[in-house]
Amino acid sequence: MSSDDEINMDDSDSSQGEIDDGCMSDDDGIVLESREQNSSDYKDNGEPDNEVLNHDSLEAEMKKTITDVQAVLQVKTGVCRILLHKYKWNKESLLERFYEHPDTTTFLIDAHVIPRRQERLPAGDAECDICCSLGELSGLSCNHRACTQCWKAYLTNKIANNAQSEIECMAPNCKLLIEDEKVMFYITDPTVIATYRKLIVASYVETNRLLKWCPGIDCGKAVRVSHWEPRLVVCSCGSRFCFSCGHDWHEPVNCRLLKLWLKKCNDDSETSNWINANTKECPKCMITIEKDGGCNHMTCKNTACRFEFCWMCLGPWEPHGSSWYSCNRFDDSAAKNARDAQEVSRANLQRYLFYYNRYMGHQQSLRLEGKLYATVKSKMEQMQTLSMSWIEVQFLRKAVDVLSECRRTLMFTYAFAFYLKRDNNAIIFESNQKDLEMETEQLSGFLERDLDNENLVTLKQKVQDKYRYVEHRRKVLLDHCSEGADQELWVFNE
């Protein structure tokens, strides 16, 4: 194979056919999956407009974008995909930069897609620099060559083990990216080919700011929006998540504070708080000491120190005289500073645990109340046997849906409140939070304990009254949070 095969100018028709047979799907149709969404879930975003795309839909959409750009650039499909990847699949940005160059070759060189100097590879057999075998060598336009088996092994490793879709030349310090047509020429294993196709689609989603993978377990679909912003999106699998950060929908706390909160919950920062609150450092050598008895007369365990001090005031023990079990030394400034720092650590830990326990409490309730769907389903079936239609009994499922949304909102209000500076607006927020929490607990208790105690005549009215009021309280809280954000009323301590 000569280097002429690597010159990136080519007829669009032939290159399109080459990639269609190996790397891309033949299905040009875009399959869109949608699910009905509640406009009340959006804040100042209008009607929901996100679309759900499966793998074939993504691949077809990617092909269409490549074809549109290829018609202008007149380059191979694989080269076009590499360029679009570099520009995060923003074809307007790519074409704008393209028109700033005098010709296609200059543009490709500046984009590091082809080398500045392209040399024809010598014909005939030669020794492979990788495996030292003698035979026909092939390579890229950068003039780096190897035997077919070495290229195959290199590319297979990059795809199967390193999960790469943008693969550089195997030569050290060569940054030339290998186009899809060349990759597909060397790779013959159907499993590796399928993996490569999936990686290409994955890179398409991950570099496109208007696409986001659904975090649902084994979902495999992506959600597309018309414009980027932190917002609720709903996948056809039922997952509801934030388009900005990919986490479960977390209104009212924003993505930045949620990230800080989750890090605080998951890392060892609170272990450090516990150490600060329950241990002290030797005033002399600063080794950490945990008190394991009632006596306040402490001796440092460090054999090189053995300093004796008072646990209460952290001052030297000797001046305490006979005060073996109490400390009356309150005038030492260094000891006072040590005690103050200790109290601050304890207070911070208690404050964190207050919000963390309530956050986790609502999270646990959300999981446990998932069982209510089975209870409600049984009740709905029972009611249908008593002459009520399927539509007439849907109020029970609606009640559980509202309960779940309120639990999720309450859970994240505690992350929001943890960072919120206390002022008049924070007091209003806490009042709304309290009202929502109280009404949510009442709805939960009714659904768990009182369904069977009500006759069918009054049950529907009571359930609807309860979930509508709870839904109203949730809206009041979220509207207040949204207005506060718009008017920049919230002050956070990070």
Curated annotation (Swiss-Prot):
GO cellular component, one term: cytoplasm
Binding-site residues for Zn(2+) 1, renumbered to this chain: 128, 131, 147, 150
Positions with a binding annotation for Zn(2+) 5: 282, 285, 300, 305
Region (TRIAD supradomain): 124-331
Activity regulation statement: Autoinhibited by the ariadne domain, which masks the second RING-type zinc finger that contains the active site and inhibits the E3 activity.
Enzyme Commission number: 2.3.2.31
RING-type zinc-finger residues: 128-174, 282-313
GO BP: protein ubiquitination; ubiquitin-dependent protein catabolic process
Subcellular location: Nucleus; Cytoplasm
UniProt keyword Nucleus, yes or no: yes
Coiled-coil zones: none
Pfam families for the chain: Ariadne (PF19422), IBR (PF01485), IBR_1 (PF22191), UBA_ARI1 (PF21235)
Main location per the UniProt record: nucleus
Disruption phenotype: RNAi-mediated knockdown on a pha-1 or on a lin-35;ubc-18 mutant background produces a high percentage of animals with the Pun (pharyngeal unattached) phenotype, whereby the pharynx fails to elongate and form an attachment to the anterior alimentary opening or buccal cavity.
GO MF, one example: zinc ion binding
Binding site for Zn(2+) 6: 310, 313, 320, 327
Catalytic activity: [E2 ubiquitin-conjugating enzyme]-S-ubiquitinyl-L-cysteine + [acceptor protein]-L-lysine = [E2 ubiquitin-conjugating enzyme]-L-cysteine + [acceptor protein]-N(6)-ubiquitinyl-L-lysine
Binding site for Zn(2+) 4: 242, 245, 250, 255
Annotated residues for binding of Zn(2+) 2: 142, 144, 169, 174
Region (Disordered): 1-52
Basic and acidic residues bias: start-end ranges: 33-52
Zinc finger (IBR-type): 194-255
SUPFAM superfamilies per UniProt: RING/U-box (SSF57850)
Role: E3 ubiquitin-protein transferase, which catalyzes ubiquitination of target proteins together with ubiquitin-conjugating enzyme E2 ubc-18. Acts with ubc-18 to regulate pharyngeal development.
Annotated family: Belongs to the RBR family. Ariadne subfamily.
UniProt-recorded name of the protein: E3 ubiquitin-protein ligase ari-1.1
Lineage, opening ranks: Eukaryota, Metazoa, Ecdysozoa, Nematoda, Chromadorea
